[in-house]
């Protein structure tokens, strides 16, 4: 970043290897540290690539690749995404207009991991989503959109199914989620940042169904994360 003349402090940069939940867990960390006055702005991003021989062999051995051997596998992908998170004061001083507000975030740890014999009832995902939506009035503050890393693996889908049973009252339609892995494959550690991009662009381009979006991710190591975004929907002249 110094070579590109970006105002980023290399000495304060940190790298985390937390899988799919990396970015949203860093949102949670940044939100808390910024509230404590430690930082005014954080650049948070995720980079992922499954396209290495050892990684592909590992996925194939565990029957996680979508194909004739496993119909409940996923399509691997690679990508990157970054988000600039700032306090309202810092954004105002920089002359920037935020395109979304991080209303709340939460993390939890699942002990019943994928590729084990233990039954997973979505306890950690339920915990993280419940904590994220805790400040909403379910009767009027509905969540309009859901972006998640459901990727075709039954384990992931079942987690959200149990969450729907517990927290359906907060959503317009808890089963009407957007799972971008259907289109671009599983983006792994880049997922959270890319979901932010999808949610904010839907609002900016006028096709979002409302201003509130829940983002959630699930890592193989048990980390579960959720974030509630609010972005004003700009009416589109091309949509009635």
What is the meaning of each model-derived region?
Residues 43-45, 83-85, 147, 214:
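Structural motif
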Residues 60-138, 144, 221, 230-240:
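Condensing-enzyme catalytic core mediating Claisen C-C bond formation in acyl metabolism
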Residues 114-118, 151-166, 187-191, 227:
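Short glycine/threonine-rich loop-to-helix capping motif typified by GTGT followed
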């Amino acid at each position: 970043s110094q070579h590109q003349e970006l105002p980023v402090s290399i000495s304060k940069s940190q790298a985390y290897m937390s899988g799919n939940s990396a970015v949203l867990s860093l949102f949670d960390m940044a939100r808390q540290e910024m509230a404590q006055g430690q930082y005014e702005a954080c650049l948070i991003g995720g980079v992922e690539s499954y396209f290495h021989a050892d990684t592909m062999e590992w996925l194939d051995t565990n029957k996680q690749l979508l194909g004739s051997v496993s119909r409940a596998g996923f399509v691997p992908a690679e990508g990157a995404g970054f988000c600039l998170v700032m306090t309202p004061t810092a954004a105002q001083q920089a002359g920037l207009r935020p395109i979304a507000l991080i209303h709340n975030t939460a993390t939890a740890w699942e002990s019943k991991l994928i590729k084990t014999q233990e039954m997973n009832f979505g306890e950690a995902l339920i915990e993280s989503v419940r904590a994220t939506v805790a400040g909403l009035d379910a009767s009027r503050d509905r969540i309009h959109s859901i972006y998640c890393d459901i990727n075709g693996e039954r384990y992931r889908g079942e987690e959200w199914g149990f969450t729907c049973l517990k927290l359906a009252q907060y959503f317009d339609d808890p089963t009407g989620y957007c799972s971008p892995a259907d289109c671009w494959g599983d983006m792994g550690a880049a997922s959270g940042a890319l979901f932010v991009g999808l949610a904010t662009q839907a609002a900016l381009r006028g096709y979002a169904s409302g201003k509130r979006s829940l983002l959630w991710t699930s890592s193989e190591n048990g980390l579960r994360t959720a974030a509630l975004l609010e972005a004003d929907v700009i009416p589109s002249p091309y949509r009635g």
